[in-house]
């Protein structure tokens, strides 16, 4: 059975802290991306090394100023910075173990695709779940974090390929990311572990 390793646990703890610091009501993919970057580690180094625009400070500014929503807000005649300021100051509270629908959708899609690549042998079948699946989730197209990455001028598909390359067996080709797969037990397990990780102190 898969259990999570320290990289997964520390990323979830950092995600919880980021959501709390930003006064969020729920955990979103943007908090997960910030948590992954705040904790650092080999995959964070891979992502930042692939595109220097994706750093903790840059993503934090992007989240605070809602740069992913700027085109839509401007179309409505609202400044993204003004919209962000209108929401401040936010009370400091910890979300009560609720994940936003976009984060749930991204985690479901990423964990199902990741599980498929493991099943067919294109990624190692490790016994411990690490932060790889979390990185893959924040780069999924429906996730807000993916839009933030694009707004910073980076390519989520390119970063995903870098993450997959780092996760693959050394010397093996980078596996192609599946477009659609059926969700199964790995997806349910990842959701349970995320829930547990976001509750832990």
Where are the predicted features?
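Histone-fold recognition with a strong bias for associated Lys/Arg-rich disordered tails
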Residues: 1-201
